[in-house]
UniProtKB/Swiss-Prot annotation:
The keyword S-adenosyl-L-methionine does not apply. This is BPI fold-containing family A member 1. Expressed in lung and trachea. Residues 81-86 are annotated as: Important for surfactant activity and antibacterial properties. The keyword Secreted applies. GO terms for biological process: antibacterial humoral response; antimicrobial humoral immune response mediated by antimicrobial peptide; immune response in nasopharyngeal-associated lymphoid tissue; innate immune response; multicellular organismal-level water homeostasis; negative regulation of single-species biofilm formation in or on host organism; regulation of sodium ion transmembrane transport; surfactant homeostasis.
């Protein structure tokens, strides 16, 4: 008797649940569980961009920048910027005649930053990069070891095409003015005067930002083209509506 009553109650509850589910529009049964908060969107975007850049080989590209070739090919003298620098200073520091290489080591992609434009319709992603630059000589090996940090700033725009498909596209992509930081990690003590360090960093100031920008920005564009469709749709909708992203500082 008790088993029959229990079965009747269970069947009644099942019928009510079925009726409620049928009343919901198809594809909208669990809208809250699928939606991401603005904070989640920011975390998902920066994490995806970071992983994408690593997958595209950004560290290998940084480690193989043709810096020495570009320095030798530039400038107003036949021997290029580096040759001009060495010629100017070799009379006081003979070791400079023996410089044979500029080697890049320890390239790193640091934690990405993100800010939203005041109108709420654009995002700016900061891509902090770092590396160590070794100026080598044939006589003593490493003459200078410089720590280099540089930020690339990427503008992300939300667009929808004629078919209504959402796209997150690359706007401006440039090195952040004043973000290049060069510091001396190691050197041969008194053999490395300040004017030498200033001269080398001055050359790097003119060459390195544009070189890194030219390599990294195409990678960002490639990563954007492979973003998860659901993530792109959510971000584009939020930007078009001017929804404020919650960004943790």
């Amino acid at each position: 008797m008790f088993q029959v009553a229990g079965l009747i109650v269970f069947c009644g509850l099942l019928a009510q649940t079925t009726a409620l589910l049928e009343a919901l529009p198809l594809g909208k049964a669990l809208p809250l569980a699928l939606d991401q908060s603005p904070t989640d969107l920011v975390g998902s975007l920066t994490s995806t961009l970071s992983n994408g850049l690593l997958s595209e080989g950004v560290l290998g590209i940084l480690g193989n920048l043709p810096l020495l070739d570009i320095l030798k090919a530039g400038g107003n003298t036949p021997s290029g910027l580096l040759g001009g620098l060495l010629g100017k200073l070799s009379s006081t520091i003979p070791l400079l005649n023996d410089i044979v290489d500029l080697q890049i080591t320890d390239p790193q992609l640091l934690e990405l930053g993100l800010v939203q434009s005041p109108d709420g319709h654009r995002l700016y992603v900061t891509i902090p990069l770092s590396l160590v630059l070794n100026v080598k000589t044939s006589v003593v090996g490493s003459l200078l070891k410089l720590a280099v940090k540089l930020n690339i700033t990427v503008e992300l725009l939300a667009v929808k095409d004629e078919q209504g498909k959402s796209h997150l596209v690359l706007g401006d992509c440039t090195h952040s003015p004043g973000s290049l930081k060069i510091s001396l990690l190691d050197g041969l003590g008194p053999l490395v005067p300040q004017d030498l360090l200033d001269s080398i960093t001055g050359v790097l100031d003119n060459v390195l930002p544009g070189l890194v920008q030219g390599e990294v920005c195409p990678l960002v564009n490639e990563v954007l083209s492979h973003l998860d469709v659901t993530l792109v749709h959510s971000i584009v909708d939020a930007l078009i509506q001017g929804q404020e992203f919650v960004i943790k500082v």
